[in-house]
């Protein structure tokens, strides 16, 4: 308990899944949390933290958050979008949205809060990427892989540029994780049971991960326990990428 006592943390994509689990764990560990999401109804069910409905695709709104929120110690960029299809079937809209949310929104959030971290003498940035794109290629996930690979590059670039300012930047790369988003994608296949079985089959541990397991890694990277870690892309994938 109290591993984040005295720290202010901001989490995007906070209404459900990994983001929500991260908010709840951070609160239990003593952090003051600001939770952001575009889903107002789900966000409103979070208790014990400050919530704000924000469209991260609106650059003007994101740029203004620094003044509104103030200095933070921890930034978790968890908001994301999963687009399906290979290169030839991917539509321009899905490709652009993948970059707008998976890369550009994270970049703007970092750009907004980084000066405050530098002035304070340090901070921790945690980007939620994926093994898809950042570590391996995954079929029918072209835009997702390309954008999450770019997020890995963003992570390392920020880490190397600001390490001497005491700012750490790392990325979590999950495998398949149970979440409302996963359920929606499974349902969209037309045979959710078969799709789930296929996802489980590619995990050597024989199961899908939980949002709470990913949140536990986010907690470690947000805390001072990981003070010697920066620029790392950490797989948490049930052994998917170990071969």
Where are these regions (language model features)?
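Active-site helix of classical SDR
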Residues: 110, 147, 155
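Alpha-helical segment proximal to the catalytic Tyr-Lys
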Residues: 115, 160-161, 227
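Short, flexible catalytic-loop segment of classical short-chain dehydrogenase/reductase
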Residues: 174-184
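Short, small/polar-rich loop/turn modules that mediate ligand/substrate recognition or access, typified
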Residues: 163, 168, 229-231
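Residue(s) in the substrate-gating loop at a strand-loop-helix junction
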Residues: 130
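Short C-terminal tail/terminal secondary-structure segment
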Residues: 135, 219, 230-243
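Substrate-binding pocket helix/loop in short-chain dehydrogenase/reductase
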Residues: 86-87, 91-99, 199
